[in-house]
């Protein structure tokens, strides 16, 4: 759901030019998205179990690999977004990424089909198991690299390409709504049907279904290529930011001026408000817009070196990015705690009683579907119930930062409940009666509620505060933060494993509950840091045509 803003009009009909772009592209885009979503979630949700059962990798090491993969899945979309914006356009990037993903999932299917591509399975009751060879790991990592790169290349690009097919903001918003619903539908299908197939039929069939979904989505997308509007690469949005920094450094000895006419302004862009004097914050950057004899052409008075002279608007755009950086840092610990909890929950589920009756056994990798369902339900409740009631009582709307704060509180509460549940589970281990897997559901429901508050609100903050030229990048900033968080969760688990005895390979002999309490303490400190940042933060003034619907779920 990263980078998406839900339209309040869930039943809006998508209109547009049915000859090139518009409504004729809708079934191709949505079908492609559904297939890619089924594929991506189908292999990643159960990755820890696959590594443990098929590669004889220890549980904590498997969790570490899973966190690294999830980190790449969250961070690489920004790289592909820059490639699409700067060089190739969205349509070629999606085509190439879908094909790369197909190669990766096909290789995973081969691994699960041929025994010589993976170590021999552990014998029943045996403690010593064959470790994977360099060849086994090489093939595995190649498959993971391909499918990760391919999946990442379609996430942001499909959202942008789909929205670009329409001209009206209402139609774009409606497409984003369908995008969100389709991604989560694919995730739920994978977390239930695909994961169940992997654990109860075979890994080969499970990965084979993912490969089939990927192949169909690739064919569907290519089939509709002649109907798409092809966006032209517009250059990297980061170039302007870099130029401001370079220009400010080159003029570091220049004395700033208090006269408006001494600063270079960008008056030709009608979409922007004409800014006179640069703001007082981050004053050292103001030199980038300060005119000097070296910066201007003597004949026409125009700037002849954009790396020495930037406009006041460009300087203010850079400042707006710097202002939200402290808020962005606050996301990192939230994502870290979620990453640790996701990994530990799978390991906990593997040592609980997952049988709901004599025949059905809940797959460990399917538990994360609870987070998705909880998040979706509360996104709707927030939009139609909670936010309107709050507005009626207080005559004010919850700001995005207030929503982020509420989400962080739910996140802390979820970690505390996870600690309590794990302490109870360890007591049942002593009594030799495995705890029911259903005890793991309440903290997952609560973390999903937290996601419904803070994730989309963070997207709204960055979308509103970033420069107009970086709005597409702004929608992926939250995803980048969570990508880094997965790497941090890997580092945190590694640190705890090295310095304590809380995380042995058999968590029945460890203290995972203490790990959760560490996350609670860190969450409280992070919440305090966020409150301080929010107190001093002021929202950027956005033109009316860029403001969001007051009934939008991110308000």
Curated annotation (Swiss-Prot):
Keywords: Membrane, Nitrate assimilation, Transmembrane, Transmembrane helix, Transport. GO terms for biological process: nitrate assimilation. It is a multi-pass membrane protein. It comes from the Eukaryota. GO terms for molecular function: transmembrane transporter activity. It is found in: Membrane. GO terms for cellular component: membrane. SUPFAM superfamilies: MFS general substrate transporter (SSF103473). It holds the Pfam family PTR2. Its main location: membrane. The chain crosses the membrane at residues 32-52, 68-88, 91-111, 127-147, 175-195, 205-225, 324-344, 369-389, 401-421, 437-457, 476-496, 517-537. Expressed in roots. InterPro entries: MFS_trans_sf (IPR036259), POT_fam (IPR000109). Transporter involved in a passive nitrate efflux. Belongs to the major facilitator superfamily. Proton-dependent oligopeptide transporter (POT/PTR) (TC 2.A.17) family. This is Protein NRT1/ PTR FAMILY 2.1. It comes from Arabidopsis thaliana. The gene is NPF2.1.
